[in-house]
Amino acid sequence: MTMQIELKEISIRELTDRYQDNAENGVTAYHGELDVRPPYQREFVYGEKERNAVIHTVEQGFPLNVMYWATRDNGTFEIIDGQQRTISICQYVKSEFAYEMRYFHNLSGDEKDKILDYKLMVYICTGTDSEKLKWFETINIAGKPLFKQELRNAVYSGSWVSDAKRYFSKSSCPAYAIGADYLTGSPIRQDYLET
């Protein structure tokens, strides 16, 4: 099967519908049908500067980089590229952080609608798992660079990697609690998993 790619406009209102970030069960959005952090994705690594740049782009009505989603066999979606931007947008709309000292819930109705009606350009990709993983590796050469372990996790995903990430790739993971004084690097960039 050759990967099929279709361009679709999705509003931030649609994207943030049923957004949920659950440390153990993952991150979902888009009516609960989008897996924002599939097994091959890294943890959220954007800092304040990057998050604010995303919100500034949306607020100004400038075009945001294209995102890539993949369809699953059950009709739901998973993010191939755009996880960091998606989480930044969802966190802002859910008032989890302020942009220019204003939380989303403090904006006027018109300001909220302008953001919620903003259209994101999303390529929906349909193909085999190996095609999707290859596409993930190909399109992730820009942006915040992936570390070698993050790329390995994209190529070698599965239940073992998912379990290992739970224990070694979160700031609240058991490995961090036990080894923080002895290990260098960042658990969310998967340095502990690589060790």
Feature-to-residue mapping (PLM):
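C-terminal active-site-capping segments
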Residues: 14-27
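Basic- and aromatic-enriched surface patches that contact anionic nucleotides/nucleic acids
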Residues: 2-17, 40-195
